[in-house]
């Protein structure tokens, strides 16, 4: 689209091989990959009285499984920030097939949060500590008028950068 540009930043992470297995008895370690529109959220991390991605996911897990583990994210996004592949991990004791958990969470979560993948992973996996790389994408729309359909997803800037 004319006037748009994309800046992609790739940050390699340090290797961490420590075992971060949860100590919940008879629990399986889960990994979810999420996509979300963060416009209406106060970031990733639970904040009292504020809607957050982590809080919505924890509440949805409670409604689906009767368990409320605190999902650990591969990073914490700020208020209004979107994600196309945020990874989270948590322990669950409920015996549920991955496809069923994915489907149930997507029916329960707000439309602005979607689970793209649900997998049972080794106990040593931890979304934050096992990450090896992160990619950040900044979209700048360089024109005098930004189309409303893009306004939530770009920085509108008509001045030289």
Task: Provide a role label for each language-model segment.
Residues 5-161:
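Structured-RNA-binding interfaces characteristic of tRNA pseudouridine synthases
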């Amino acid at each position: 689209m004319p006037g748009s540009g994309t800046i992609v930043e790739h940050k390699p992470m340090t290797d961490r091989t420590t075992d971060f297995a949860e100590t919940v008895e008879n629990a399986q370690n889960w990994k979810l990959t999420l996509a979300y529109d963060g416009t209406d959220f106060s970031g990733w991390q639970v904040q009292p009285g504020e809607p957050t991605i982590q809080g919505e996911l924890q509440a949805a897990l409670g409604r689906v499984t009767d368990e409320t583990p605190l999902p650990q994210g591969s990073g914490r996004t700020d208020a209004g920030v979107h994600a196309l592949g945020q990874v989270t991990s948590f322990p669950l004791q409920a015996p549920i097939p991955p496809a069923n958990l994915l489907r149930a969470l997507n029916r329960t979560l707000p439309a602005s949060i979607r689970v793209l993948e649900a997998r049972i992973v080794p106990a040593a996996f931890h979304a934050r500590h096992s990450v090896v790389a992160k990619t950040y994408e900044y979209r700048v729309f360089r024109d005098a008028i930004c189309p409303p359909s893009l306004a939530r997803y770009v920085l509108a800037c008509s001045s030289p950068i």
